[in-house]
């Protein structure tokens, strides 16, 4: 079965409010206090929030994308789903490198069979090479203890991101419970070392399936789960299974202990962008994420915001941007294909594996194939501003130490020594009658965390 989807999208590059170091001028808001380390005084019930766009007063750039996606749908083995092949045309030219199987008959006659096989092997080797790099990168990441983690330059940044995930997961679990209050099943796609296991336990789910490409990470995830069971003697904990697989290339249903299993939630945190190397990989990721969701189930996650990444890139004088915490480097400006738009991401001096741009309107359109409807998409800043109004969320922010106390007390020091990194907080203190210390993130951390967004899709009845 063949279908053709044509879209002409006029999209104005999105941007969050610009960084402005004058609190009064930028309209910075107060919302919450935080507790830092145990030896620090209680902070005021307000957070000085620095607006988090990377470049001030940078003009929006209007882009017109004329996209034609041709999908060849074939019957699959598991549940009548479809795999697809794409041809992406822009200005009459294809952005995707054609595979041997997509060549016309005329080209086949001009190219010897052994050359075709060589080309196929090269393409497969490139794909396998990137998947192996992703697995190797996460396998090599060392487990870090709580003490060392608290000394990290990005301690508060990580905690803030973790708070975002906690609120997202808790909110969606509540939505599921409005429909059913027991036997909640979850698929954690790209689970890593199991950083969200505690969230699922607190959410009182019944069953969890964890899947990730990195085998060592999966072993560590499973060990965390076993340790959690041992610590909770008589307390109920969900059952779990652990699958090592490339979720952008392998069909997970074939690896489930129960091939008839369906889920209420699929969570994919900071991972789905790896699948946008090609349409086929992005579709397999969505098939794994959404193909086995119950009606009314949710696909949720966090991912880099392509509009913000491109906005910062275009505002930069080079092919890269960032600060001392993070850097993003593209191969070139002005050419952003829908698939395979690679960039290198570096966090706190650690070189990460290549990532791929996710054009979110395309993700939304592709998800419709699996009967998914976008419920919301928000930048981290938008999500924070909305959720911090809830008192329980405020308390969780403090417990998770997701904000830094400013100014630091005499027994501690600020996370950043960079000049101007707390100018927004200092300026606010001058112009407001507040109790100290305040809760905030450094300017550098705001810039790093504001490249992300949260999303939630719902499976239609």
Curated annotation (Swiss-Prot):
CDD domains: AdoMet_MTases (cd02440). It comes from the Eukaryota. Catalytic subunit of the mRNA-capping methyltransferase RNMT:RAMAC complex that methylates the N7 position of the added guanosine to the 5'-cap structure of mRNAs. Binds RNA containing 5'-terminal GpppC. One of its GO terms (biological process) is cellular response to leukemia inhibitory factor. This is mRNA cap guanine-N(7) methyltransferase. It is found in: Nucleus. Belongs to the class I-like SAM-binding methyltransferase superfamily. mRNA cap 0 methyltransferase family. MRNA binds at residues 161-162. Residues 1-117 are annotated as: Disordered. The modification Phosphoserine is found at residues 11, 15-16, 58, 94, 99. Pfam families: mRNA_G-N7_MeTrfase. It comes from Rattus norvegicus. The lineage of its organism: Eukaryota, Metazoa, Chordata, Craniata, Vertebrata. Residues 14-29, 49-58 have a biased composition (Polar residues). It is an enzyme of class 2 (transferase). InterPro entries: mRNA_G-N7_MeTrfase_dom, mRNA_G-N7_MeTrfase_euk, RG7MT1, SAM-dependent_MTases_sf. The record marks 193, 199, 224, 273, 355, 452 as: mRNA cap binding. Methyltransferase activity is activated by RAMAC. S-adenosyl-L-methionine binds at residues 165, 190, 212, 246, 269, 274. Residues 152-460 form the mRNA cap 0 methyltransferase domain. GO terms for molecular function: mRNA 5'-cap (guanine-N7-)-methyltransferase activity; RNA binding. Residues 65-93 have a biased composition (Basic and acidic residues). Keywords: Methyltransferase, mRNA capping, mRNA processing, Nucleus, Phosphoprotein, RNA-binding, S-adenosyl-L-methionine, Transferase. Its EC number is 2.1.1.56. PANTHER family: MRNA CAP GUANINE-N7 METHYLTRANSFERASE, MRNA GUANINE-7- METHYLTRANSFERASE.
